Amino acid sequence: SGSCEVKTCWWAQPDFRAIGDYLKDKYDSASEMAVEKHRESRGWVETLRARYALFKPPTERDLVYYEGSPNFCEPNPETGSFGTKDRTCNVTSHGIDGCDLLCCGRGHNTRTEKRKEKCHCIF
């Protein structure tokens, strides 16, 4: 009789939060690129180069962009964005739902509501 060993290897997906954090870090440190057109024997060729020579050139693992993001604060019918006017924000938050960021520095109005609701409490 013989013995048999089985070895199984597999790749596991990292935690979803870890993936999101990784992508956010990449986004925050993305390098702006410029498109340069030059003529070669096969015709016009477009290449990307770092827009600012002051910064180190991006590596193959860095995120790059060559067009700026649209202004999400203002409405844009072309993209279907309604902007952030009249959105509800969180006065106490310093995050993306906070009034300073969500209202794009335009200020905000505070509204206090008083409601009477049955709580269905049992004592």
From Swiss-Prot:
InterPro entries: Wnt, Wnt_C. GO terms for cellular component: extracellular space. The keyword rRNA-binding does not apply. A lipid is attached at S1 (O-palmitoleoyl serine). Glycans are attached at N90. The keyword Disulfide bond applies. Disulfide bonds join C89-C104. Keywords: Developmental protein, Disulfide bond, Extracellular matrix, Glycoprotein, Lipoprotein, Secreted, Wnt signaling pathway. This is Protein Wnt-3b. It comes from Plethodon jordani. The gene is WNT-3B.
